A protein has these predicted regions:
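NAD(P)+-binding Rossmann beta1-loop-alpha1 motif at the extreme N-terminus of oxidoreductases
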Residues: 1-49
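Short, acidic/turn-prone active-site loops that include or flank metal/cofactor-
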Residues: 32-34, 52-55, 92-94, 115-118, ...
């Protein structure tokens, strides 16, 4: 079995590495020599190698799991040194679609393998043998595709994927991932929950009860949705919840809401969002958002309840 060299040791890379190690799949971690994560990787029982060393380029398959915005610099520094036929896996299609690495580095096979999970959850679900999905694209792979797909099947199983992996395109994965983050996962869900919490407490509802209703139950509801599917979920809920769901659907999901969703997707497709990312001060935005949530009544209630119930 060909070894995988994982470049980086953030949340996603750490989960990949530990899952593969626990599955006895050959893997090692590649880091800069002075990277503080070097010791963390080795103390986790993973082999570590210095990026750019002669040993580093020995393997045939790599996973580039450093942040997307660092991919260009990494390949500019090291891309030409990879042997012809080397394969690099990407956990998200964004940098591939934006920078067209297949044209800049045609001697490398650029392959998408995208687990549909954040790194911490990838590790957690692996340990409890939960459901983990992934998609992949080999549209820029030019070697022995049958041999590689057999390797990827074994790799996918070893990392914990048991839903798929399903074939897609780099373009589709990138656009769907960005759209789901903007329209649902990282915006609608947390911000709607926060507004609901604020609305309940403003009307005299105890913060602890509001927390249960608007935040804690999210996980329980989503678990049920994933376990039984959309139809099964609406078969499952109580009559009050069923009638209330229809009322909320009619009042909240207006044509204006749909137009806003369409606008988000259009700005992903036409490149406007790419430009926003290029021009953004990520740290300034992150600090602003973190400070907003840090002072929110929902966060303060979460911290209070966690302290009371360690």
């Amino acid at each position: 079995m060909m070894r995988l060299t994982i470049i980086g040791f953030g949340n996603q890379a750490r989960a990949w590495g530990l899952n593969l190690k626990d599955s006895n799949f050959p893997v090692r971690i590649a880091l800069r020599s002075k990277n503080a994560s070097f010791e963390g990787a080795t103390s986790s029982g993973l082999e570590a190698v210095e990026i750019g060393s002669s040993d580093f380029f020995q393997d045939e398959i790599f996973a580039l799991l450093i942040p997307d915005q660092l991919h260009v610099e990494f390949l500019k520094n090291h891309g030409e040194h990879f042997r012809p036929g080397t394969t690099i896996l990407y956990a998200h299609g964004y940098s591939l679609l934006k920078h067209q690495f297949e044209l800049l580095y045609p001697h490398i096979n650029h392959v998408l393998f995208a687990p549909k999970s954040i790194g911490t959850e990838l590790r957690k679900q692996f340990l409890i043998e939960g459901k983990l999905g992934a998609v992949y694209s080999t549209e820029h792979f030019h070697g022995d595709s049958l041999l590689f797909e057999q390797w990827m099947k074994n790799f996918s199983k070893a990392i914990g994927i048991n839903l798929g992996p399903y074939r897609t395109t780099i373009k589709n994965e990138t656009e769907a991932d960005l759209y789901s983050e903007q329209g649902l996962l990282c915006s609608l869900i947390p911000y709607a929950a926060s507004e609901m919490f604020r609305g309940l407490t403003d009307k005299g509802i105890e913060p602890e009860l509001a927390y249960f209703e608007c935040w804690h139950e999210l996980k329980l509801i989503v678990n049920a949705m994933v376990d039984v599917g959309p139809k099964g979920f609406f078969d499952l809920i109580s009559p009050n919840a069923l009638i209330g769901s229809e009322k909320g659907y009619q009042k909240l999901f207006t044509p204006a809401f749909q137009n806003n969703l369409n606008s988000l997707f259009s700005e992903i497709q036409d490149g406007s969002f790419n430009q926003e990312i290029d021009e953004a001060n990520v740290e300034e935005i992150r600090n602003r958002i973190i400070n907003r949530w840090k002072a929110s009544p929902l966060q303060l209630t979460f911290e209070k309840m966690k302290q009371e119930n360690p």
